[in-house]
UniProtKB/Swiss-Prot annotation:
PANTHER family, sorted: GUANINE NUCLEOTIDE-BINDING PROTEIN GAMMA SUBUNIT
GO molecular function per UniProt: G-protein beta-subunit binding
Protein name as catalogued: Guanine nucleotide-binding protein G(I)/G(S)/G(O) subunit gamma-5B
Gene name tied to this protein: GNG5B
Summary of the function given for this chain in its UniProt record: Guanine nucleotide-binding proteins (G proteins) are involved as a modulator or transducer in various transmembrane signaling systems. The beta and gamma chains are required for the GTPase activity, for replacement of GDP by GTP, and for G protein-effector interaction.
Record carries keyword Transmembrane helix: no
Amino acid sequence: MSGFSSVAATKKVVQQLQLEAGLNSVKVSQAAADLKQFCLQNAQHDPLLTGVSSSTNPFRPQKVCSFL
């Protein structure tokens, strides 16, 4: 049994390595530059940077009912 499982495990490893060999690689510096560019281009749409208006914020404190 262990021989069969070893062959199966080796086949899995070979398949994974073949998959990884076919991927296009990008330098980390280029990926970081692309990510920075994306963040700068989309900063005006990021609610963590621009904030959320109080009228559309579902987590704002609820107002107290004045009838009570």
